[in-house]
Amino acid sequence: MDQYPDENEEFELQYQDELELLEDLPDEFNAYDGPSTSKQAAEKQKENRAPVAALRDSTRLGNSTLGSPQLSQITFGASQLGGEEEAEGTSSGGQVNRRLFGTPKGPPVGRGCSTPFQRMPAIQELENTQLTSRSYGLEKENAAANQLQEVGLKNVNKRRLERDLFGDIDDLFHESYEDPMVKKARTEEQRDHEAIERILELRRKMRESSKTLRKDDVSRLKALHDFKMRNLSYEIPNWPFLAIQRSDLERIYVRFHSEDYEQRQLDLISARGEVVGSLLGEAKDKIWQEAGEIVLSRATAAEDADVTLVNSNANSEPGRLWVDKYKPRKYIDLLSDEMTNRSLLYWLKMWDKVVFGKAFHSKREQEAVTGEGGTAGGAANQLNSFNKRTGKFESNGGWRQRKSRQALNTNVDALGRPMQKVALLCGPPGLGKTTLAHTIARHAGYNVREINASDDRSPEAFKLALENGTQMSSVLNEDKRPNCIVLDEIDGAPRQSIDYLVKFISDAVYTKVKAKGAKAEHNVLKRPIICICNDVYDPALRPLRQVAFVVTFPPIDAARLAERLVKIAFKEQLKTDFGSLIALAEKSGNDVRSCISSMQFFNAQKHSLTLQDVLNNNLGQKDRHQGLFAVWDAIFRIQRPRKTLHTDANKVDEPAQVTMTNTSVTTRVRNVLEVVHSSGDYERLTQGVYENYLQQKMPDPNFTGVCEALKWFCFTDTVQHQISRQQNYSVYPYLQYGFVAWHLLFATLAWPKIAFPTRGFEFQQKSTNQRNIFQALCKGVTTSALGVGQGGTLLLDTVPLLKRILSPQLRSVAVQLLSPKEQQDLRHTIEVMVDLGLTFVQVKSQEGHYVFQTEPDLDALSAFPGYTGLSLPYFSRQLIAREVDLERIRRAAPKGGAPSAPAAKKKTSGAAAQLPNHLQTLKPKPISASNMHSAPKQQLTKDFFGRITHKSTSTNSAEESKTDAIVKSPIWYRYKEGFNNAVRKDVHIHELL
């Protein structure tokens, strides 16, 4: 209960004003500050104490109050009592406890204490009158107040006030003047509130003063509504009017005003201008004149510069193409998508560490160091973060945060190069891909070296140009800038050049060794390479697409392109309008080069470019190859109707009419046929439609369209089979009508979700793999096991059951410890596997464990994904694999025995006659005596003239005959000094002879 005031504090708060009035009395009337030295002062003290005692009698105090522990702590000293109290000895010689009522220490100012009981006589008087104060409290209080008022007036009248000296001077004070006494009585909190109110009041006055310059939105809307109500009418009014007609054939009557009304409005505007001028001060006219001169000088300078530029260009370079003339020179001049520009520039800046020696910090590293929003660890993993710049908490999205799909890998290798060392720009022609590569490369500080891959298609020339552009000897040019290689039309390069580029990027190219014995070093790529192509899905670009940073070039916005064309037309003084340029951009497919060339053609003919010319002429149109996604988009989406300008070619004089585009079924069918025919790859288009048609929004809730679409898929498959297998190209034109049927079944106004078809390729790879496995299985079947079937019978009837047949239940023990039943099952499994040519091979699984699988893999032929079936443990497979190898060796060994003598003799003679080549040995040729002593033989020869002569050969001695027989032997032996490690077999001389 210490926080609540007691009776004494309530008294002080109730009569605070009167007590402060007593404090302001002169010194001769203040008898409470200390003991008096004169009797007159003592008498005055008694007289002044009486009204105070009367005031204190009016409080409602009881006996409990006087005997409370708070009052028992009050002590009185000589300094606090008057002279009579000291004489009577009513004081106990102490001081008032100032902590009890919060009285500050130090000499008393005014009243000696904040308590109402600072004099002992007052307490005694209250004790004597406590019984009567309850019944006569109101009369006592009124009497005490009257006495206090008389004393106060008597004391105040003795002082001369300002009003007595100067009269009424309240009008001299400013509105901000405040009585010092009142100002002193306020607390600090009240002063703060008053300062806030003062600031708000000044702001309100400032807003009211600025209302003459600007009204709020509600006031302006109200004023506009009142103006229309006074000056516009849908009915015939009473005031003068002018009738006009809207586009919906409704008439509106506009009011005519007199000249006096116009003059009054002008005067009102000028009066408002004077208010504005008063804010600017006396120098308003001078400031306004200087501002006008600055604006006029800038406009004149710009017009003069444009006229000078146009005239100089027209005179100096009359035959220069506008495409080269207005080619972007700086980054801000690019018309392409900003995200595309920033992505390519970010990839180029990742080469700064290798090329320029500057440290490059990726976005992830910066967020890890500084953190998003100023936090030390980054706020990517937090739900909320505090942003020091704004001083607010910001939501990071948490688990709902959309993760951006970045095709760029921001990681770097050991040398500080990006992981994707080549950028691949792809998009339709004419959008500015080459211009973008040149501009961003120069902006990043490189010297652009362009190589057109379709100029010289030989791999040697491509290799030489690529090496010269990236070698350190020719890296720096006159401007001391490193080279950036730009390979334009990379899709026109041969496959060998693309393969060499991939090896060059992967640091797999080695330099030629000049010195003998030197070690070849691989070439390290230290310069960025930018490749440009039209079709990123070209088969030749498949190896490059896997290692490159692919940047898809989106089409340029038609409105943004038209704004740039307006500037060019203004500089070249070509008369045209914004609508005509937008129509030209849309008709050309937002092709920048085509639009600028068309404008230059009309300017050369001294003819203005109008909307009629754009619609009637074949401007900006060219035979472009439609991409696969563009064709699929045309199949699954209905084009929204747009406003067009319809003209009749036969009636040129009649004005054109604005109509909506035709969205009838006939027009849609014609558009689909044109788009599909421009692509030509019907098989790939069919696969894309087949894999994406179920992902689209079905306009048919009964799914009858799905059944109809499947019939068209069967029809298309049949036609393609006739073309590919039987070479029947007479049915080729019917392939495109299936896309028309699918368009009419599944096309909607919504944007389709299309994914590139990959299931056909995956199924083809799986089919090829399974076909190879089955062929290996058929080759391994021995002749004794041909009864199990061949072809489809083996695949359907035998293979599904082999997994269960080849899975015996064996214990994990040695072969000698197996039971007879287990040994019989093991022997049967081994015989079946040897007859079918199967075995277990140890391979490494995707998890990193080694397992035994059948070779050929029967699981790929018979097991479904996710169904393991019956399987053997690792130990059993290892045991069976070992026994199968031993059985194959045992069967391959020749069978031996001890046959009988006649049979052995016959067998030996037969074996000698049919001995295999690898077992036969060379035997010496016998020289018989008959040959040595044979009779001479006649030999027929021809002489020089061609006549036939007979020559007799006589026999020589036995030694000569023996030597001649040896010389005529087909095998010679010659000793050669040295040895050869390739000969590993010991050969004796008798084996050769």
From Swiss-Prot:
PANTHER family according to UniProt: P-LOOP CONTAINING NUCLEOSIDE TRIPHOSPHATE HYDROLASES SUPERFAMILY PROTEIN
Gene3D superfamilies xref list: 1.10.8.60, P-loop containing nucleotide triphosphate hydrolases
Function of the molecule: Chromosome cohesion factor involved in sister chromatid cohesion and fidelity of chromosome transmission. Component of one of the cell nuclear antigen loader complexes, CTF18-replication factor C (CTF18-RFC). The CTF18-RFC complex catalyzes the ATP-dependent loading of PCNA onto primed and gapped DNA and has weak ATPase activity. The CTF18-RFC complex catalyzes the ATP-dependent loading of PCNA onto primed and gapped DNA.
GO-annotated molecular function: ATP binding; ATP hydrolysis activity; DNA binding
Region span, Disordered: 26-72, 892-913
Localization per Swiss-Prot or TrEMBL: Nucleus
Residues annotated for ATP binding in this entry: G427, P428, P429, G430, L431, G432, K433, T434
Keywords assigned by UniProt, alphabetized: ATP-binding, Cell cycle, DNA replication, DNA-binding, Nucleotide-binding, Nucleus
Family statement: Belongs to the activator 1 small subunits family. CTF18 subfamily.
Biased composition (Low complexity): 894-913
The protein's assembly and partners: Component of the CTF18-RFC complex.
Name of protein: Chromosome transmission fidelity protein 18 homolog
Effect of loss of the gene: Viable. In ovaries, results in defective oogenesis leading to sterility. Results in morphological defects in both eye and wing. Simultaneous knockout of cutlet and RfC4 or RfC38 exacerbates the eye defect of the single cutlet knockout.
CDD domains in alphabetical order: AAA (cd00009), HLD_clamp_RFC (cd18140)
